[in-house]
């Protein structure tokens, strides 16, 4: 499945709820979902009547597919890579669904977003691609890099003088850091302390439906 290059706000409307893909804009009146909370397309309003997107008619497969697509869109992951994460989660000990969510949460772009160093995962990916971050002292430009306990993420010394990073401390202080991460705003450094527990991950994600989707294929 190819990458969606259209307006990301349509993805929220397709899911029938905010996915917070555009950072701070999603919390303002400028959010497209606030103005048009129905599905995109010619028949979007009709499909949305009767509560949300008329999910009562959905088959089990449709619900499983929707759960998988929602997770993909939240984390900005392509289908091939998402499937690879699922296969890795199968080989790990424990619950496959939780393993999958932990893999997604441990991506570098997501960790940067969770630390408050970016307003969205998309922005975090862009910052990483431009080489503004280091992991354990080494510069990286791979947003999909999977982090582990003890890994240190820092803003590259040469990037700290840029206007965006000069004003970052004010923005970062307004964001709550999850307990599985440790952040030092003054030093512009974050550390992965452990993998997140299920309660610390987006509760609207349904990992069981995702597992069921791939299990039947």
PLM-predicted stretches and their roles:
Residues 114, 118-123:
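Internal active-site segments that recognize and position negatively charged phosphoryl groups
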Residues 121, 127-128, 147:
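Short, well-ordered loop/turn sites that connect or cap secondary structure elements
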Residues 1-115, 139-217:
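Ferredoxin-like alpha/beta domains used as RNA- or RNAP-binding modules
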Residues 131-135, 139-141:
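Glycine- and Gly-Pro-enriched alpha-helical subdomains that act as flexible
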């Amino acid at each position: 499945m190819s990458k969606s290059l259209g307006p990301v706000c349509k993805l929220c409307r397709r899911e029938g709820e905010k996915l917070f893909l555009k950072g701070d804009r999603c919390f303002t009146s400028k959010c497209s979902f606030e103005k048009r909370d129905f599905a995109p397309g010619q028949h979007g309003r009709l499909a949305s009547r009767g509560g949300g997107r008329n999910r009562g008619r959905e088959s089990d497969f449709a619900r499983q597919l929707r759960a998988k697509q929602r997770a993909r869109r939240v984390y900005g992951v392509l289908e091939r890579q998402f499937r690879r994460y699922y296969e890795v989660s199968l080989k790990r000990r424990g619950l496959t669904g939780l393993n999958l969510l932990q893999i997604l949460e441990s991506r570098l772009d997501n960790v940067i977003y969770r630390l408050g160093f970016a307003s969205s995962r998309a922005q975090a990916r862009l910052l990483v691609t431009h080489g503004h971050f280091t992991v354990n002292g080494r510069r990286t430009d791979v947003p999909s890099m999977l982090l582990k306990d003890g890994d240190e993420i820092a803003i590259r010394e040469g990037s700290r003088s840029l206007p965006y990073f000069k004003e970052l401390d004010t923005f970062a202080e307004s964001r709550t850091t999850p307990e599985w991460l440790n952040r030092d705003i003054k030093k512009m450094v974050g550390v992965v302390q452990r993998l997140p527990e299920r309660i610390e991950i987006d509760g609207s994600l349904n990992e069981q439906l995702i597992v069921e989707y791939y299990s039947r294929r």
